[in-house]
Amino acid sequence: MNFTQSFKLALKSLKTSKMRAFLTMLGIIIGVGAVIVILSLGNGMTNMMNSQFEKMGSNLIQVMTYGRGTGGTRDVDVEDLYELVDKYPQYLTGVTPYVSASAKVRYQTDDYARTSVYGVSEAFFKEDTKGTMQGETLAEGRFLSYIDVDRHQNVCVIGDYLAQTAFRGDALGKTISLSGVPYTVIGVLSKSGDSSEGSADDVIYIPYENAQRMGTGTMMMGTDEMFLLTATSRDTASAAKGIVEKRLYKTYQSSDYYMVMTSAEMMDAMNTMMNTMMIVLVAIAAISLLVGGIGIMNIMLVSVTERTREIGIRKSLGAKQKDIRGQFVIEAGTTSAVGGVLGIVF
Protein backbone atom coordinates (compact mmCIF):
# COMPACT_ATOMS: atom_id res chain seq x y z
CA MET A 1 0.00 0.00 0.00
CA ASN A 2 1.51 3.30 -1.07
CA PHE A 3 1.40 6.62 0.81
CA THR A 4 -1.49 8.05 -1.25
CA GLN A 5 -3.74 5.10 -0.45
CA SER A 6 -2.80 5.25 3.24
CA PHE A 7 -3.53 8.99 3.33
CA LYS A 8 -6.95 8.52 1.73
CA LEU A 9 -7.78 5.79 4.24
CA ALA A 10 -6.67 8.10 7.07
CA LEU A 11 -9.02 10.86 5.85
CA LYS A 12 -11.84 8.32 5.51
CA SER A 13 -11.22 7.20 9.09
CA LEU A 14 -11.44 10.81 10.32
CA LYS A 15 -14.71 11.37 8.43
CA THR A 16 -16.20 8.18 9.82
CA SER A 17 -15.93 9.37 13.45
CA LYS A 18 -15.89 13.16 13.22
CA MET A 19 -16.59 13.92 16.89
CA ARG A 20 -13.93 11.52 18.08
CA ALA A 21 -11.44 12.97 15.59
CA PHE A 22 -12.25 16.53 16.67
CA LEU A 23 -11.80 15.73 20.36
CA THR A 24 -8.52 13.99 19.54
CA MET A 25 -7.32 17.10 17.66
CA LEU A 26 -8.49 19.55 20.32
CA GLY A 27 -5.25 19.50 22.30
CA ILE A 28 -3.23 20.21 19.13
CA ILE A 29 -5.64 22.98 18.07
CA ILE A 30 -5.43 24.71 21.46
CA GLY A 31 -1.66 24.28 21.67
CA VAL A 32 -0.92 25.67 18.21
CA GLY A 33 -3.38 28.53 18.70
CA ALA A 34 -1.88 29.42 22.10
CA VAL A 35 1.68 29.48 20.74
CA ILE A 36 0.67 31.71 17.81
CA VAL A 37 -1.28 34.13 20.02
CA ILE A 38 1.55 34.41 22.56
CA LEU A 39 4.16 34.98 19.84
CA SER A 40 1.98 37.59 18.14
CA LEU A 41 1.29 39.48 21.38
CA GLY A 42 4.94 39.29 22.41
CA ASN A 43 6.18 40.59 19.07
CA GLY A 44 3.57 43.35 19.12
CA MET A 45 4.61 44.47 22.61
CA THR A 46 8.30 44.32 21.68
CA ASN A 47 7.73 46.40 18.54
CA MET A 48 5.65 48.92 20.49
CA MET A 49 8.34 49.35 23.16
CA ASN A 50 11.09 49.58 20.56
CA SER A 51 9.18 52.32 18.75
CA GLN A 52 8.84 54.23 22.03
CA PHE A 53 12.59 53.95 22.66
CA GLU A 54 13.30 55.05 19.09
CA LYS A 55 11.19 58.16 19.66
CA MET A 56 13.32 58.95 22.71
CA GLY A 57 16.44 58.84 20.60
CA SER A 58 19.69 57.05 21.27
CA ASN A 59 21.26 59.87 23.29
CA LEU A 60 19.02 59.76 26.38
CA ILE A 61 20.64 58.88 29.72
CA GLN A 62 18.61 57.85 32.77
CA VAL A 63 19.99 58.26 36.29
CA MET A 64 18.45 56.72 39.42
CA THR A 65 19.79 57.05 42.96
CA TYR A 66 18.88 54.88 45.97
CA GLY A 67 20.29 56.57 49.08
CA ARG A 68 23.14 58.55 50.57
CA GLY A 69 25.82 55.92 50.08
CA THR A 70 28.87 55.40 52.27
CA GLY A 71 31.06 58.31 51.31
CA GLY A 72 29.03 61.40 52.11
CA THR A 73 26.19 62.98 53.97
CA ARG A 74 24.04 64.06 51.03
CA ASP A 75 22.59 62.87 47.75
CA VAL A 76 23.53 64.07 44.30
CA ASP A 77 20.98 66.67 43.28
CA VAL A 78 20.06 68.40 40.04
CA GLU A 79 22.53 71.23 40.70
CA ASP A 80 25.40 68.73 40.64
CA LEU A 81 24.24 67.46 37.27
CA TYR A 82 23.80 71.01 35.96
CA GLU A 83 27.48 71.52 36.78
CA LEU A 84 28.36 68.48 34.68
CA VAL A 85 26.40 69.84 31.72
CA ASP A 86 28.22 73.18 32.02
CA LYS A 87 31.60 71.49 32.46
CA TYR A 88 31.25 68.99 29.59
CA PRO A 89 29.20 70.71 26.86
CA GLN A 90 30.86 68.49 24.25
CA TYR A 91 29.18 65.45 25.85
CA LEU A 92 26.04 66.66 27.66
CA THR A 93 23.37 69.11 26.52
CA GLY A 94 20.62 69.01 29.14
CA VAL A 95 19.37 67.55 32.42
CA THR A 96 16.04 67.46 34.20
CA PRO A 97 14.67 65.84 37.35
CA TYR A 98 11.97 63.31 36.52
CA VAL A 99 9.41 62.89 39.28
CA SER A 100 6.53 60.48 38.80
CA ALA A 101 3.19 60.93 40.54
CA SER A 102 -0.48 60.34 39.89
CA ALA A 103 -3.43 62.60 40.47
CA LYS A 104 -7.20 62.61 40.36
CA VAL A 105 -8.24 64.88 37.51
CA ARG A 106 -11.31 67.08 37.69
CA TYR A 107 -12.60 69.60 35.16
CA GLN A 108 -15.56 71.71 36.21
CA THR A 109 -17.98 69.11 37.62
CA ASP A 110 -16.56 66.06 35.83
CA ASP A 111 -14.14 63.63 37.47
CA TYR A 112 -11.70 61.50 35.48
CA ALA A 113 -9.55 58.48 36.28
CA ARG A 114 -6.20 58.93 37.99
CA THR A 115 -3.66 60.12 35.46
CA SER A 116 0.13 59.80 35.36
CA VAL A 117 1.74 63.11 36.32
CA TYR A 118 5.42 63.76 35.64
CA GLY A 119 7.41 66.55 37.21
CA VAL A 120 10.14 67.95 34.95
CA SER A 121 12.13 71.11 34.34
CA GLU A 122 12.16 73.32 31.26
CA ALA A 123 15.14 71.31 29.92
CA PHE A 124 12.81 68.35 29.30
CA PHE A 125 11.69 70.19 26.16
CA LYS A 126 14.42 70.46 23.52
CA GLU A 127 14.28 73.54 21.31
CA ASP A 128 16.40 71.97 18.55
CA THR A 129 13.92 69.14 17.94
CA LYS A 130 10.77 70.92 19.18
CA GLY A 131 10.06 67.84 21.25
CA THR A 132 10.66 66.34 24.67
CA MET A 133 13.57 64.17 25.73
CA GLN A 134 11.24 61.19 25.25
CA GLY A 135 10.28 62.11 21.69
CA GLU A 136 6.88 63.72 22.31
CA THR A 137 5.98 66.83 20.32
CA LEU A 138 3.66 69.76 20.98
CA ALA A 139 0.42 70.00 19.05
CA GLU A 140 -0.40 73.46 20.37
CA GLY A 141 0.60 75.91 23.08
CA ARG A 142 4.00 75.85 24.73
CA PHE A 143 6.03 73.77 27.13
CA LEU A 144 7.16 74.64 30.66
CA SER A 145 9.53 77.62 30.86
CA TYR A 146 12.30 78.43 33.34
CA ILE A 147 9.98 80.94 35.05
CA ASP A 148 7.25 78.29 35.42
CA VAL A 149 9.67 75.90 37.11
CA ASP A 150 11.55 78.48 39.20
CA ARG A 151 8.34 80.04 40.57
CA HIS A 152 6.52 76.70 40.94
CA GLN A 153 3.70 77.93 38.73
CA ASN A 154 0.55 75.83 38.64
CA VAL A 155 0.70 75.22 34.90
CA CYS A 156 0.66 71.95 32.98
CA VAL A 157 1.09 70.35 29.58
CA ILE A 158 -1.38 67.55 28.91
CA GLY A 159 -1.53 64.58 26.55
CA ASP A 160 -3.94 64.14 23.66
CA TYR A 161 -6.20 61.72 25.56
CA LEU A 162 -7.11 64.19 28.30
CA ALA A 163 -7.36 67.06 25.79
CA GLN A 164 -9.94 65.14 23.76
CA THR A 165 -11.79 63.53 26.67
CA ALA A 166 -12.14 66.49 29.01
CA PHE A 167 -11.90 69.47 26.66
CA ARG A 168 -13.09 68.12 23.31
CA GLY A 169 -9.87 69.41 21.74
CA ASP A 170 -10.11 72.94 23.17
CA ALA A 171 -7.84 72.76 26.23
CA LEU A 172 -5.51 75.78 26.08
CA GLY A 173 -6.09 78.25 28.89
CA LYS A 174 -8.56 76.00 30.68
CA THR A 175 -8.11 75.12 34.36
CA ILE A 176 -8.15 71.57 35.69
CA SER A 177 -7.82 70.26 39.22
CA LEU A 178 -5.03 67.79 40.04
CA SER A 179 -5.79 66.20 43.40
CA GLY A 180 -7.57 69.39 44.44
CA VAL A 181 -4.96 71.86 43.16
CA PRO A 182 -5.92 74.06 40.15
CA TYR A 183 -3.57 73.99 37.13
CA THR A 184 -3.80 75.99 33.91
CA VAL A 185 -3.26 74.12 30.65
CA ILE A 186 -0.51 75.86 28.63
CA GLY A 187 0.23 73.13 26.09
CA VAL A 188 -1.13 69.98 24.47
CA LEU A 189 1.06 67.13 23.21
CA SER A 190 0.58 65.54 19.80
CA LYS A 191 -1.08 62.14 19.65
CA SER A 192 1.58 59.44 19.91
CA GLY A 193 -0.41 56.24 20.36
CA ASP A 194 -4.00 55.03 20.48
CA SER A 195 -4.97 57.94 22.76
CA SER A 196 -6.64 55.74 25.35
CA GLU A 197 -6.75 55.71 29.13
CA GLY A 198 -3.42 54.65 30.59
CA SER A 199 -1.59 55.03 27.27
CA ALA A 200 1.38 57.27 26.44
CA ASP A 201 -1.17 59.99 25.56
CA ASP A 202 -2.69 59.93 29.05
CA VAL A 203 -0.01 62.06 30.76
CA ILE A 204 0.41 65.45 32.40
CA TYR A 205 3.67 67.40 32.82
CA ILE A 206 4.10 69.93 35.63
CA PRO A 207 7.11 71.65 37.32
CA TYR A 208 9.09 68.98 39.18
CA GLU A 209 8.92 70.57 42.63
CA ASN A 210 5.13 70.71 42.30
CA ALA A 211 5.14 66.96 41.60
CA GLN A 212 7.39 66.33 44.59
CA ARG A 213 4.82 68.04 46.82
CA MET A 214 2.23 65.51 45.69
CA GLY A 215 4.27 63.00 47.71
CA THR A 216 3.67 59.96 45.54
CA GLY A 217 7.23 58.87 44.86
CA THR A 218 9.48 58.76 41.85
CA MET A 219 9.52 56.95 38.55
CA MET A 220 10.71 53.62 39.92
CA MET A 221 9.78 52.10 43.25
CA GLY A 222 12.61 52.34 45.78
CA THR A 223 14.44 55.24 44.14
CA ASP A 224 15.19 58.49 45.94
CA GLU A 225 15.83 60.57 42.83
CA MET A 226 15.56 60.18 39.09
CA PHE A 227 17.06 62.37 36.37
CA LEU A 228 17.12 62.42 32.59
CA LEU A 229 20.11 63.75 30.67
CA THR A 230 20.78 64.07 26.95
CA ALA A 231 24.14 63.43 25.34
CA THR A 232 25.21 65.55 22.40
CA SER A 233 24.86 62.57 20.06
CA ARG A 234 24.55 58.80 19.92
CA ASP A 235 28.32 58.52 19.54
CA THR A 236 29.01 60.45 22.75
CA ALA A 237 26.34 58.71 24.86
CA SER A 238 28.73 56.11 26.31
CA ALA A 239 31.34 58.74 27.18
CA ALA A 240 28.65 60.96 28.72
CA LYS A 241 27.43 58.01 30.80
CA GLY A 242 30.97 57.47 32.07
CA ILE A 243 31.25 61.13 33.13
CA VAL A 244 27.97 60.91 35.07
CA GLU A 245 28.96 57.63 36.74
CA LYS A 246 32.31 59.10 37.81
CA ARG A 247 30.53 62.05 39.43
CA LEU A 248 28.05 59.81 41.23
CA TYR A 249 30.76 57.49 42.50
CA LYS A 250 32.64 60.48 43.91
CA THR A 251 29.64 61.22 46.14
CA TYR A 252 28.38 57.73 46.99
CA GLN A 253 31.70 55.80 47.04
CA SER A 254 29.78 52.75 45.84
CA SER A 255 27.96 51.84 42.64
CA ASP A 256 25.23 50.13 44.70
CA TYR A 257 23.53 53.47 45.35
CA TYR A 258 22.86 54.53 41.79
CA MET A 259 22.19 53.24 38.29
CA VAL A 260 22.96 54.95 35.00
CA MET A 261 21.59 53.64 31.70
CA THR A 262 21.55 54.92 28.15
CA SER A 263 18.42 54.52 26.03
CA ALA A 264 20.21 51.84 23.98
CA GLU A 265 20.95 49.88 27.16
CA MET A 266 17.36 50.31 28.33
CA MET A 267 16.09 48.95 25.02
CA ASP A 268 18.48 45.99 25.17
CA ALA A 269 17.43 45.21 28.76
CA MET A 270 13.75 45.43 27.81
CA ASN A 271 14.24 43.17 24.79
CA THR A 272 16.13 40.63 26.91
CA MET A 273 13.33 40.63 29.48
CA MET A 274 10.67 40.27 26.78
CA ASN A 275 12.55 37.43 25.08
CA THR A 276 12.90 35.58 28.39
CA MET A 277 9.21 36.06 29.13
CA MET A 278 8.31 34.89 25.62
CA ILE A 279 10.37 31.71 26.02
CA VAL A 280 8.64 30.91 29.32
CA LEU A 281 5.15 31.58 27.94
CA VAL A 282 5.77 29.62 24.74
CA ALA A 283 7.12 26.72 26.81
CA ILE A 284 3.94 26.75 28.91
CA ALA A 285 1.78 26.86 25.77
CA ALA A 286 3.84 24.05 24.25
CA ILE A 287 2.77 21.81 27.13
CA SER A 288 -0.71 21.71 25.61
CA LEU A 289 0.90 20.53 22.36
CA LEU A 290 2.57 17.73 24.27
CA VAL A 291 -0.72 16.82 25.94
CA GLY A 292 -2.41 16.85 22.54
CA GLY A 293 0.26 14.55 21.14
CA ILE A 294 -0.16 12.14 24.05
CA GLY A 295 -3.92 12.22 23.45
CA ILE A 296 -3.44 11.24 19.81
CA MET A 297 -1.07 8.44 20.87
CA ASN A 298 -3.66 7.06 23.30
CA ILE A 299 -6.42 7.16 20.70
CA MET A 300 -4.19 5.35 18.20
CA LEU A 301 -3.50 2.61 20.78
CA VAL A 302 -7.23 2.26 21.41
CA SER A 303 -7.83 2.23 17.66
CA VAL A 304 -5.39 -0.67 17.23
CA THR A 305 -7.33 -2.67 19.82
CA GLU A 306 -10.68 -1.84 18.19
CA ARG A 307 -9.50 -2.68 14.67
CA THR A 308 -7.94 -6.09 15.30
CA ARG A 309 -10.43 -7.67 12.88
CA GLU A 310 -9.46 -5.18 10.13
CA ILE A 311 -5.78 -5.83 10.81
CA GLY A 312 -6.33 -9.59 10.57
CA ILE A 313 -8.16 -9.29 7.25
CA ARG A 314 -5.35 -7.13 5.82
CA LYS A 315 -2.73 -9.63 6.93
CA SER A 316 -4.69 -12.47 5.30
CA LEU A 317 -4.70 -10.46 2.07
CA GLY A 318 -0.92 -10.12 2.18
CA ALA A 319 -0.37 -6.87 4.09
CA LYS A 320 2.97 -6.74 5.87
CA GLN A 321 3.63 -5.59 9.42
CA LYS A 322 5.27 -2.38 8.19
CA ASP A 323 2.22 -1.59 6.00
CA ILE A 324 -0.14 -1.82 8.96
CA ARG A 325 2.21 0.14 11.20
CA GLY A 326 2.63 2.78 8.48
CA GLN A 327 -1.16 3.11 8.17
CA PHE A 328 -1.57 3.99 11.84
CA VAL A 329 1.42 6.37 11.76
CA ILE A 330 -0.07 8.18 8.76
CA GLU A 331 -3.45 8.41 10.52
CA ALA A 332 -1.76 9.92 13.60
CA GLY A 333 0.21 12.34 11.42
CA THR A 334 -2.89 13.36 9.47
CA THR A 335 -4.81 13.98 12.70
CA SER A 336 -1.96 16.15 14.02
CA ALA A 337 -1.62 18.04 10.73
CA VAL A 338 -5.34 18.81 10.47
CA GLY A 339 -5.37 19.92 14.11
CA GLY A 340 -2.36 22.17 13.48
CA VAL A 341 -4.02 23.77 10.45
CA LEU A 342 -7.23 24.39 12.41
CA GLY A 343 -5.17 25.92 15.24
CA ILE A 344 -3.49 28.30 12.79
CA VAL A 345 -6.74 29.27 11.05
CA PHE A 346 -8.86 29.76 14.13
Locate the predicted segments by residue.
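Hydrophobic, regular-secondary-structure patches
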Residues: 42-116, 123-126, 146-147, 164, ...
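Alpha-helical membrane-interface segments at transmembrane helix boundaries
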Residues: 11, 15, 42, 46, ...
